Amino acid sequence: MLKRIILMVLILCGLAGCSGEEVDPKAIAQYYAGLEGVTIEAEITVNSGALAEYGILFTRTAEGDRVEILRPESLAGIRATILPDKAAIEYDGMALETMLPGISGFVPADAVTGMLDDLAKGVPEYYGEEELEGHPAVVLSYIRELEGTTARKLIWVERETGRPLRAEFYLDELMVMEVGVKNFVA
């Protein structure tokens, strides 16, 4: 247990620049890759021609990712289990297996999965420091070309703790989704 605490302090010092050095995106990736379980409550706003807002509860465990819709009330209780290359939608004891869209991480069901995967495994095209809603933050930009579309994610994490704060999702420079993290427990 002591080794784990020391490792976390070292990773966070690298993330937060305890020595006054610039933030290292590799330290951020190391922190997220080392997380064994995560719970995130988030607000997701989708703008793909019509505006839609969702409140979700996301949980990552060794078995996979799980998302439950909290809001709007008309969809509350719908759950999705997300595994590599597939998902299962569950409601009121019934389940339906489904495929994820070709551009993974760009729909509300797998937005948090994609955000965490980029933070853990991605190499940001750009990163820098800025303030976000009163928090000293690090912004990381991840870009991929998918199916002839440029997919970009901007992800802000709190500088001192590494806690995710916000993400914006762009397809061909048009913002299609935002994720605001309300609670993060690792």
Where do the language-model regions lie?
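Short, surface-exposed charged micro-motifs
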Residues: 55-57, 77-81, 128, 152-156
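Short, solvent-exposed coil/turn segments at beta-strand boundaries
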Residues: 34-39, 59-65, 81-86, 135, ...
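A mature extracytoplasmic/lumenal domain signature
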Residues: 44, 71-73, 82-84, 93, ...
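An acidic-aromatic
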Residues: 57-111, 175-177
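Flexible, processing/modification-adjacent segments and terminal tails
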Residues: 23-24, 31-34, 42-44, 89-146, ...
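N-terminal leader/targeting segments and the immediate start of mature chains
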Residues: 12-64, 74, 185
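Sec-dependent bacterial lipoprotein signal peptides
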Residues: 1-17
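Gly/Pro-enriched, hydrophobic low-complexity segments
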Residues: 128-186
